[in-house]
Amino acid sequence: FRERQIPLMIGGATTSRVHTAVKIAPHYDGPVVYVPDASRSVSVASSLLSDESAKKFIQDLRDDYVRIREQHANKKAAPTISLEAARKNREMIDWASYVPEKPKFIGRRVFKNFALSDIAKYIDWTPFFQTWDLAGKFPAILDDEVVGVEARKVFADAQALLDKLIKGQWLQADAVVAFYPANTVGDDIVLYSDETREHPLFVWHNLRQQSERPVVDGVRRPNRCLADYVAPKDSGVADYLGCFAVTTGHGVEKKVAEFQAKHDDYSAIMLKALADRLAEAFAELMHHRVRTDLWGYASDEILTNDQMINEEYRGIRPAPGYPACPAHEVKEDLLRVIGSEDIGMTLTESMAMNPASSVSGFYLAHPDARYFNVGKLSDDQVEDL
């Protein structure tokens, strides 16, 4: 590696090949490889280590990144507007006619040793196949002419291992959910310790879209910010915000080590993939309980699992690091406020959650709340933070 330098492999939910080629590769002399999922990391490492194929692999990679950068440079970006103009074009909500539902409790509640069999019912299987580089939507992928045979094989293997981990209780599923009084001041959401709304727990600084929005049917689309969906403090409306953290990661590393000791890398990767799917399913299950019971703002909701996967419910659960809330740093305040240490969840120096198979975020209940991509910011918003 002295000649090749240490390779850098990039992956994760918020990364992409374009981001790797444009933002990372030009600033590192060694090989930089975008790895879309964990199952491909072994083959990528093998290619980088191989005396026969490494040189061509690295050169092909660099040529590909040059092409991607050229395509990116030739794309016409939407012009940005000033922060003042973006705020004037915020999502307009009639707060005078909105009465927020009050959660059944204020503060936090911990859920330990949740039944894995119940969580498994909420699994979205489509991303599971992406882990194995199999493109297609479940269940149609099982009959796909190109990848159907392989998809059926890994799905059968997944079902068998899932059955074993549920019966053997290999993993532990824990969650913490919290509700707090909340109101907005500008683009910031302020969480309070109690109904007096005098003692802030923390201020969640949010970002607003600044790209010039298109005009549809004579109406310009709004420049959205998550703060638009929580009542402003000066409205006099007593609003609320939910916070959560779930994990199905306890027990994963121990079992993975057992598989690796037997040189069974396939089962080790399969278990990690299932643990990740269970974590996302656990987040879906708890959000369902929040909507229908713990907060109860959609107590009459009756949706199938497919409808929940398609997000046909009221409200959203934005997570730090994703397009509507790209800043990972908010995880520090989020996990502190909900006391994530009670479920064994911590943050690494790079703001990743530990255990890895974990999900955290917020609950916004307003009927108009939706996901969006913050996108490119202008200097005035960066300076305003």
Predicted regions and their residues:
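Short beta-alpha connecting loops at secondary-structure transitions
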Residues: 1-7, 25-36, 45, 114, ...
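Short, ordered loop/turn segments at secondary-structure junctions
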Residues: 10-15, 36-39
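Glycine-rich, charge-decorated loop segments at or immediately adjacent to ligand/cofactor-binding or catalytic sites
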Residues: 15-29
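Short alpha-helices
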Residues: 37-42, 277, 281
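Active-site loops and adjacent core secondary-structure elements that bind or stabilize anionic groups
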Residues: 39-269, 273, 294
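C-terminal accessory domains/tails appended to large, multi-domain proteins
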Residues: 221-384
